[in-house]
């Protein structure tokens, strides 16, 4: 007999936004503060963005496809952009995964400051890229 657990059971009936808020609170340190800050900037850049909770605990922001994920590690918070290699980055905000053909990432460490304007520009560019791919 195979026991299947539904998503509702795993998430205890909570919305992805609630789960992301809980993750931020659980972290309880600079990583939670950083995740909260980038979440706020993402929502400011794209008020229509959808928050999702995937892969057993990874916050995901989507609009016409995945824009980015927000993973927290012991030493840093990683924002991975699914199609980051196709996004222009004139400010050099991407600092991880630079050799890949698809993804790019931003690794944020304790004390790092975010170039808010450049970050929002990357979010908008990712949404625009997702939207243009859907229309074809």
Task: Place the predicted regions along the sequence by residue.
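Charge-dense, helix-prone N-terminal extensions
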Residues: 1-136
């Amino acid at each position: 007999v195979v026991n299947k657990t539904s998503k509702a059971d795993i998430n205890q009936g909570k919305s992805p936004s609630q789960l992301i808020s809980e993750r931020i609170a659980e972290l309880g340190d600079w990583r939670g503060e950083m995740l909260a800050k980038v979440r706020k900037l993402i929502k400011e850049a794209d008020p229509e963005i959808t928050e999702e909770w995937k892969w057993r605990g990874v916050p995901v922001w989507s609009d016409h496809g995945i824009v980015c994920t927000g993973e927290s590690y012991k030493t840093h918070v990683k924002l991975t952009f699914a199609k980051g290699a196709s996004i222009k980055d004139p400010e050099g905000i991407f600092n991880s995964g630079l050799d890949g053909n698809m993804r790019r990432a931003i690794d944020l460490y304790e004390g790092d400051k975010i170039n808010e304007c450049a970050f929002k520009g990357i979010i908008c560019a990712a949404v625009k890229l997702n939207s243009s791919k859907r229309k074809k």
